[in-house]
Amino acid sequence: MNANIRLGKISSIDYAKGMARVVYHEKDDDVTRLIPLLSHEYKMPPVGSQVLVVHLSNGTEAGVVLGRPWSEKNVPPESGASLYRKDLGQNPGDAMIRYDGSTLTIKC
């Protein structure tokens, strides 16, 4: 079974269910039904943010939002070979966990 991977934008969010609707501008602004986000963390992407979505190829609308890819508009706040960083807020650096291989930083 082949999957269909698309790039779209979050059009609305059901915060209680952890699901979102995604709009595909290249498909005449077609909007999905509510689909889940692939995550066991609760951090919903902002409405209007770009996301990758996998749809099953069985002819249904079944799919899952994989997450937000890095892009020219959504760049990593910092980088490094052994860096782990998890931003907890919508604005990078406001609240985060950071580990660079030797130092653990927790900012809140």
Residues covered by each model-derived region:
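Extracellular beta-strand solenoids
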Residues: 99, 106-108
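Exposed beta-strand/loop interface patches that mediate assembly or binding
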Residues: 1-100
